């Protein structure tokens, strides 16, 4: 492949960057870019001497299309790997269009001022990317991502037809903390506190947050409580798996997590509505 520009330097980005460096024959060179360049420099220092991949760093505001275009033109990557926040998907896609650079992300776009995520905003770019002769690969994490690959493989190689898909996302880890999120806390809490939905009979069925609970005995992990959530791969699978009748997505949560989340909700800390605090406007969830 040659060179990749990786935007973001949080937990998910760190894992992806480590994996890129383990495959230096593919990722010969990477540039790590983030609003806080010191995080990029720290990760670069940690990785140097452990990989043949050449690593550079850069500062960029991923909300600013002009800054992104300038960075892409300077780095000249073969592909941009977007591991920033979902709010920034569209600005990064715009920059890739302007520079005719291939694009990959792991989570679909959602507006910062609305706790709602769906593919419609990004799917609207399909013709633009086709006309530019470049590829945009959306939702290339585990879920979404691997879940879609598993479903497509099963349809092609194992089944004549698939009518029902249930995706069960289980975190069996326990590090002893009473409350911790699986990924970016702000995005995770927005996702969990939003209304759920699933696809059935050709239309969407909406549920209240955490309304539908099931118990499942996960091999190697044990019995866990899981709750129905909306998730983006439901949209893409409903579109691309012919004959599908129902698709649902469940995620496991421990009681301690849910208790702390409820406390945060009760005191207004999960709200995305701006409020005034000590003369400044803040968003409680980000605070």
Predicted regions mapped to residue ranges:
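Conserved N-terminal Rossmann-fold NAD(P)-binding element of oxidoreductases
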Residues: 4-11
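N-terminal Rossmann-fold NAD(P) dinucleotide-binding loop
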Residues: 13-17
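Short beta-strand element of Class I
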Residues: 29-31
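Helix N-cap at the beta1-alpha1 junction of Rossmann-like dinucleotide-binding domains, i.e.
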Residues: 36-39
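Rossmann-fold cofactor-recognition segment
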Residues: 49-64
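Conserved Rossmann-fold cofactor-binding substructure of NAD(P)-dependent oxidoreductases
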Residues: 61-77, 84, 88
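Rossmann-fold NAD(P)-binding glycine/threonine-rich loop
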Residues: 107-134
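C-terminal catalytic/substrate-binding lobe primarily of soluble NAD(P)-dependent oxidoreductases
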Residues: 156-287
């Amino acid at each position: 492949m040659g060179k990749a520009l990786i935007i973001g330097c949080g937990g998910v980005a760190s894992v992806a960057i480590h994996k890129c460096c383990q495959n230096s024959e593919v990722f010969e060179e990477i540039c790590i870019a983030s609003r806080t360049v010191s995080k990029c420099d720290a990760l670069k220092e940690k990785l140097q001497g452990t990989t043949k991949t050449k690593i550079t760093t850069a500062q960029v505001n991923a909300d600013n299309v002009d800054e992104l275009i300038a960075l892409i033109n300077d780095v000249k990557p073969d592909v941009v790997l977007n591991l920033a926040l979902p709010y920034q998907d569209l600005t990064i896609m715009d920059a890739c269009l302007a520079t005719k650079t291939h694009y990959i992300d792991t989570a679909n776009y959602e507006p910062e001022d609305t706790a709602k995520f769906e593919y419609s905003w990004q799917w609207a770019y399909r013709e633009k990317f086709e006309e530019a002769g470049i590829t945009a690969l959306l939702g290339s994490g585990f879920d979404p991502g691997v879940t879609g690959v598993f479903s497509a493989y099963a349809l092609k190689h194992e089944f004549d037809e698939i009518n029902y898909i249930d995706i069960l996302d289980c975190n069996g880890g326990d590090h002893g903390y009473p409350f911790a999120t699986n990924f970016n806390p702000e995005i995770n809490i927005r996702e969990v506190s939003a209304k759920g939905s699933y696809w059935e009979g050709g239309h969407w069925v909406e549920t209240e947050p955490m309304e539908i609970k099931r118990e499942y005995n996960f091999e190697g992990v044990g019995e866990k409580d899981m709750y129905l959530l909306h998730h983006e791969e439901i949209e893409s699978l409903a579109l691309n798996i012919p004959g599908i009748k129902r698709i649902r997505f469940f995620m496991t949560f421990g009681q301690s997590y849910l208790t702390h989340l409820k406390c945060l909700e009760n005191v207004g800390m999960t709200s995305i509505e701006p409020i005034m605090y000590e003369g400044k406007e803040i968003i409680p969830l980000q605070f």
